[in-house]
Amino acid sequence: PVSRQQCSQRIQGERFNQCRSQMQDGQLQSCCQELQNVEEQCQC
């Protein structure tokens, strides 16, 4: 599986601004589904 850091580095574009903000706030669970929709190997 891909690490959280690697997954966060893959999140680019305006549609993921909220996702990045949640990760910075430590709300990884809120971001996890969105990450997995883009990169199935991402594990949160």
From Swiss-Prot:
GO terms for molecular function: nutrient reservoir activity. One of its GO terms (biological process) is defense response to oomycetes. The keyword Disulfide bond applies. It comes from the Eukaryota. Coiled coil: none annotated. Keywords: Antimicrobial, Disulfide bond, Fungicide, Seed storage protein, Storage protein. Disulfide bonds join C7-C42, C19-C31. Belongs to the 2S seed storage albumins family. The mature protein consists of a small and a large chain linked by 2 disulfide bonds. This is a 2S seed storage protein. Has antifungal activity. Inhibits spore germination in H.sativum (IC(50)=62.5 ug/ml) and P.betae (IC(50)=62.5 ug/ml). Inhibits growth of H.sativum, V.albo-atrum and P.infestans. This is 2S seed storage albumin protein. It comes from Taraxacum officinale.
